[in-house]
Regions:
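C-terminal motif of bacterial Sec signal peptides marking the signal peptidase cleavage site
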Residues: 23-27
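Paired acidic/hydrophobic, glycine-rich loop segments that form the ligand-binding mouth/hinge
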Residues: 117-122, 258, 275-280, 295-296
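Early extracytoplasmic/lumenal segment of secretory-pathway proteins
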Residues: 44-131
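Mature extracytoplasmic/periplasmic domains
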Residues: 313-379
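Extracytoplasmic/periplasmic substrate-recognition and gating elements
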Residues: 279, 288-341, 411
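Extracytoplasmic ligand-binding site segments that recognize negatively charged/polar headgroups
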Residues: 71-80, 105, 117-118, 122-270
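Bacterial signal peptide processing site
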Residues: 29-32
Length: 411
């Protein structure tokens, strides 16, 4: 997920995303898996829906003639020729991609409503509400996207992209952040995230250069330091926050590279510079595609993860092409193509047969009938805010996460 087009092999398929149709039909209950896929509120931002600056902007009533251009901000790997080229031929909308390496970069690119340059962004749950409440996304007429009705209920109007019943985009895919390892160095799969904090692997660890990693540390401490009483890795008291930052600061001497781009982590493993690290199914898929002995697991402590949305920029210069894209990318066939190529889970519940057409058994391989317990083991990204979900102003806001990451962790 970042900058620079990824040349992934269609033969490289990740078997890491485990979620069932029955799971998503239930929705995201309480606990770690519930952070972004329920309701239609501000998801604990403490900000009233009336404060969304663009809430009353008019929406398209019908899709008109395409403008010929579509400017997208995307995670690396989200705009592969397999599905972009047919879209361009069908619509006449030529896709121009700008790749971002972090959610912070996406938020920055979307400032001032995309600046009249960008049409859409494939943002994750830790960025969506920042973009929405900054007035940089505009409401979407979900009725112009027929395949939206085929989505699992949990992703039709999730709290990370829908505020007070107003949609600011259309859900796309979701997946976990996984523990990657070189099978030659680890004949037996690691079972705990503790391996990336182990001094034994000094200079061999790679993790994202992203403040949201503080949540990964908090999730680890939730199990290994229960006295902290962490219940949600994105809602941390000052004491819980400092403990998580301290753990990451102690990890710094072990880090070979804080990667900004997915392609950087791929290179670290291919070159033998990294033997273990935190990454996405995309990197796993790409490395498998070149026959690299990569392994990946969701350890016993669980994992953080993302749920992505194609959000419409407030000043999108090509709205008709943007709506055409949302309609196209939401269809089961295209969702299946991206899911199998990237190694993530589609939001369209009808994508499964198309996945098996692309790669026989891939729907089962991605554990589409996984138990609810797996879904709950994934803590989906959301924006840390000062007001906790219990209404108390005891949580550390994201601005302090950013500051701690740059001043206490990576430097």
């Amino acid at each position: 997920m970042t900058a620079g087009m990824r040349n992934s092999s269609r033969a490289a398929r990740s078997a890491l995303i485990l979620v069932a149709a029955g799971v998503l039909a239930v929705g995201c209950g309480s606990g770690s898996g519930s952070s972004g896929a329920s309701g239609g509120s501000s998801s604990g931002t403490g900000t009233a829906a009336s404060q969304v600056p663009t809430a009353n902007l008019p929406v398209l009533k019908s899709i008109g003639k395409g403008e010929g251009t579509l400017n997208l901000i995307a995670w690396e790997g989200y705009l592969q020729p397999e599905w972009v080229n047919p879209f361009e031929k069908q619509t006449g909308c030529q896709v121009h991609a700008t790749y971002a390496g972090t959610s912070d970069q996406m938020v920055a690119l979307m400032k001032n409503g995309g600046g009249g340059q960008y049409d859409m962004v494939s943002s994750s749950g830790d960025a969506d509400l920042r973009i929405i409440y900054a007035g940089d996304a505009r409401p979407v007429n979900i009725n112009l996207i027929p395949s939206w009705k085929q989505f699992f209920p949990a992703f039709q109007s999730p709290a990370f992209n829908t505020v007070d019943g107003v949609h600011y985009g259309v859900s796309l895919q979701w997946g976990p952040n996984v523990l990657m390892y070189n099978k030659k160095d680890f004949p037996a799969p690691p079972t705990s995230w503790s391996i990336i904090y182990n001094p034994k692997y000094k200079g061999q660890v790679t993790v994202p250069d992203n403040p949201i990693q503080i949540a990964d540390a908090a999730l680890y401490l939730k199990t290994h330091n229960p006295s902290l009483k962490i219940t949600d890795p994105y809602e941390l008291t000052q004491n819980q926050f400092q403990a998580s930052v301290k753990l990451l600061a102690s990890q710094r001497p072990l880090i070979k590279k804080y990667w900004d781009l997915a392609s950087q982590e791929i290179s670290e493993f291919k070159n033998g510079d990294a033997t273990v690290g935190a990454g996405w199914p995309y990197q796993v898929s790409a490395l498998k595609g070149v026959k690299f002995p990569i392994g990946a697991v969701v350890p016993a402590e669980g994992a953080t993860g993302w749920a992505d949305t194609w959000m419409l920029a407030a000043k999108a210069p090509h709205p008709n092409c943007a709506y055409m894209w949302m309609r196209y990318i939401s269809t089961p066939k295209v969702q299946a193509e991206q899911a199998v190529d990237y190694g993530e889970t589609p939001d369209n519940k009808l994508a499964c047969p198309f996945m098996n057409q692309i790669q026989q058994g891939s729907c089962e391989e991605f554990h589409a009938n996984a138990p609810l317990s797996y879904f709950k083991s994934i803590s989906l990204w959301k924006t840390p805010v000062a007001t906790c979900d219990n209404g108390q102003p005891d949580c550390v806001p994201y601005s302090q996460w950013q500051q701690a990451w740059t001043t206490q962790v990576t430097q």
